[in-house]
C-alpha cells in the first residue's frame, strides 16, 4: 500500500493527488478489481490465451501494414 507523508506547508489536495498517483503507479485499483471475484484457473488460462492471440494478431497486422506501404 503506497503511503504519502503530508508536509507542513502542503495543502491536503496536493497530498491527495500525490497519493492517488502513487496508488496508480503501484497498481492498487487494477489489482483490487482483478481480485474482486474469484477466477477459476481455467478462466484465467482462457483469458491469458485470448490475450496472447490478440497480441499475435496485432503484431502480424503491424508487420503486414509495414510491408504493404509502397512510397
UniProtKB/Swiss-Prot annotation:
State the Gene Ontology terms under molecular function.
structural constituent of ribosome
Q: Name one GO biological process term.
A: translation
One Gene Ontology CC term in the entry: ribonucleoprotein complex
Q: Which InterPro entries match?
A: Ribosomal_bS21, Ribosomal_bS21_CS, Ribosomal_bS21_sf
Q: Which domain of life is it from?
A: Bacteria
Look up the coiled coil feature and give its residue ranges: none
Identification of the protein by name: Small ribosomal subunit protein bS21
| Originating species | Hydrogenovibrio crunogenus (strain DSM 25203 / XCL-2)
Gene behind the chain: rpsU
Amino acid at each position: 500500500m503506497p503511503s504519502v507523508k503530508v508536509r507542513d506547508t502542503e495543502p491536503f489536495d496536493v497530498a491527495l493527488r500525490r497519493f492517488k498517483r502513487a496508488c496508480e503507479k503501484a497498481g492498487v485499483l487494477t489489482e483490487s478489481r482483478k481480485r474482486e471475484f474469484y477466477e477459476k484457473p481455467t478462466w484465467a488460462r482462457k483469458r491469458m490465451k485470448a490475450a496472447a492471440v490478440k497480441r499475435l494478431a496485432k503484431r502480424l497486422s503491424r508487420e503486414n501494414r509495414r510491408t504493404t506501404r509502397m512510397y
